Amino acid sequence: MALPSEQMAPDPQGRIHTFCSALEPGQPGQAGWYQMGATLSAGMALRWLRDSVLGWTQPDAYDAMTALAAQAAPGSQGLLFLPYLVGERTPHMDPAARGAFWGLTLRHGQAELVRAVLEGVTFACYDAFAVLESLGGAPAEIILAGGGARSLLWQQIVADVFGRPVRPLQTSEQSALGAILLAGAGVGLFDLATTAQAWASYGEVVAPDASRRGLYAERLAAFRELYRRNKSHPS
């Protein structure tokens, strides 16, 4: 989770990272800083499920996984996933945090496993967002980038959990494009902020489903409690 800011505003508790942006800090109306909440196992958690649990090797495995997850009901029939496979940074700063599936029963199948991972990663990202929000950041919408932005199901889960519209960034090879923008602006070919906005390409906005707000609020509370309980039982 990254949030642009005109002011340098580090978190006194050290739960987020504060960086200079590529824009010059201190200029009025210009986001010269950004704050970042780091979730260590986001796409990595889905890859772990693909490789180590499902064992799927087909090129379209991720598409097949999210299509399968769409068959499961929101909330994954009570199944929760903690995505702390390599510890966690924001908000816990806990290298000893560990992942878990909790609530498994005979009624759960592959669809619930995949959806629980998507939901668990989203809960972890929301925890990072909540820290940014507590420090004064309150964006009206979420811009989703990366591989997860290609999944309509994951877009909807993010919108529902965050309670905000989601705009997926469809610009391909985002890192390479960023390097081009920085290089071009660095040699004076164009204005960085103006060109970055002009070159960005977005998909359709996904609105949150208000009927799921209560469900996901309950699941988020259970997710947070599971971390607290799991923390008292180190591996």
Task: Name these PLM-found stretches.
Residues 1-235:
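Active-site core segments that coordinate phosphate-bearing ligands/cofactors
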